[in-house]
């Protein structure tokens, strides 16, 4: 599962997810991509489940790029704890995703295979997604 090696601070405030993604909203590596249509926190477990679904489907051909990283710690209090006594301990890591953000990219496979792999990956995610195709194929150097 993905998580930062070390962070400056152990705990973060929750923040807000307003507006569209300004960075990470264009295809950079592969020929096909999965783009977020809704704002959400995507956990490292969901990212890993999506990655496994895609790699199992495309098998040995092609390459997958994960364009999001879970860098936000989410804290939780123990069950049946009284109010007060500070903030809970970090339990898991999430990636903050805004609409328009590219989540995954695939290259080196046909469009049908990429579309099906992305469809399987989207079932593991808590948001609506969109399949994107590069307008002109990328030249291999």
From Swiss-Prot:
It comes from the Bacteria. Binds 23S rRNA and is also seen to make contacts with the A and possibly P site tRNAs. InterPro entries: Ribosomal_uL16, Ribosomal_uL16_bact-type, Ribosomal_uL16_CS, Ribosomal_uL16_dom, Ribosomal_uL16_sf. Pfam families: Ribosomal_L16. Belongs to the universal ribosomal protein uL16 family. The keyword tRNA-binding applies. One of its GO terms (biological process) is translation. The lineage of its organism: Bacteria, Bacillati, Cyanobacteriota, Cyanophyceae, Nostocales. GO terms for cellular component: cytosolic large ribosomal subunit. HAMAP family: Ribosomal_uL16. Part of the 50S ribosomal subunit. PROSITE patterns: RIBOSOMAL_L16_1, RIBOSOMAL_L16_2. PANTHER family: 50S/60S RIBOSOMAL PROTEIN L16, LARGE RIBOSOMAL SUBUNIT PROTEIN UL16M. This is Large ribosomal subunit protein uL16. GO terms for molecular function: rRNA binding; structural constituent of ribosome; tRNA binding. Keywords: Ribonucleoprotein, Ribosomal protein, RNA-binding, rRNA-binding, tRNA-binding.
């Amino acid at each position: 599962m993905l998580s930062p090696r070390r962070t400056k601070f152990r705990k973060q405030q929750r923040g807000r997810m307003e507006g569209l993604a300004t960075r990470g909203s264009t295809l950079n590596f592969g020929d096909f991509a999965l783009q977020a249509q809704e704002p959400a926190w995507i956990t490292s477990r969901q990212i890993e489940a999506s990655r496994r679904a895609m790699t199992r489907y495309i098998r040995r051909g092609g390459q997958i790029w994960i364009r999001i990283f879970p860098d936000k710690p989410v804290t939780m209090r123990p069950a049946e704890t009284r109010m007060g006594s500070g903030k809970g301990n970090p339990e898991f890591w999430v990636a903050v995703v805004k609409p328009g953000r590219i989540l995954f990219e695939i290259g080196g496979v046909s469009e049908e295979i990429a579309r099906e792999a992305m469809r399987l990956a989207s079932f593991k995610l808590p948001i609506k997604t969109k399949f994107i195709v590069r307008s002109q194929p990328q030249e291999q150097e």
